[in-house]
Structure formats: structure tokens, C-alpha cells
């Protein structure tokens, strides 16, 4: 019973983190769809705040043993790759 509860908590933690990551990904995709300036201070502020918050959530979940560190790193890495693609797309549009 205890191991079932732990597994349930782990699944919930991962689902919540993935939902938060999806929100950030949608923000990045909206920006990419409109290809507005990614250096916009408001956009950068919101994205930085969201990424920092998610990284703290991931760290907390890892420290509690709810997710593996590799899972958290993979989640954050995917978002960072999407952000990099946004900057590249904007740079290519400018040329």
C-alpha cells in the first residue's frame, strides 16, 4: 500500500511538472508563431520567471524523490531547445 501511494505521488508530481512545462512551451510557440522580437523585455521577463519557477519545482520534486534528476533535466532541456529555436527563427527572419 505504501509503495502504491509513493508511485501515485510520483505520477502526480511528474504530471504537474509536465503541465507547467507545457504552459511555458505554449508561450514559446505563440512567440514563434508571431515571430515578434524575442528580446522584448516583457516577454523575456515572463519567460525567465516561468523557467526559474519550473526549475525550482523540478529541484523540489527531485529532492523529495518524486522524479529522477534526469527527468527534470530532460524537461528543462527541451524547453531551452525550444527557446533557442525561437531566437534562431527570429534571427533568420531578420536576414
Curated annotation (Swiss-Prot):
Lineage: Bacteria, Bacillati, Bacillota, Bacilli, Bacillales
A Pfam family of this chain: DUF1507
Family from the record: Belongs to the UPF0358 family.
NCBIfam families: PRK13666.1
Region forming the signal peptide: none
Highest taxon, organism lineage: Bacteria
Protein name: UPF0358 protein BC_3949
Origin species: Bacillus cereus (strain ATCC 14579 / DSM 31 / CCUG 7414 / JCM 2152 / NBRC 15305 / NCIMB 9373 / NCTC 2599 / NRRL B-3711)
Amino acid at each position: 500500500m505504501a509503495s502504491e501511494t509513493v508511485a501515485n505521488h510520483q505520477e502526480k508530481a511528474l504530471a504537474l511538472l509536465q503541465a507547467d512545462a507545457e504552459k511555458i512551451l505554449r508561450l514559446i510557440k505563440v512567440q514563434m508563431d508571431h515571430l515578434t522580437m524575442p528580446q522584448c523585455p516583457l516577454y523575456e521577463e515572463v519567460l525567465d520567471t516561468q523557467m526559474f519557477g519550473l526549475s525550482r519545482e523540478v529541484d523540489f520534486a527531485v529532492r523529495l524523490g518524486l522524479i529522477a534528476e534526469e527527468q527534470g533535466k530532460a524537461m528543462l532541456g527541451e524547453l531551452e531547445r525550444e527557446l533557442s529555436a525561437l531566437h534562431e527563427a527570429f534571427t533568420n527572419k531578420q536576414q
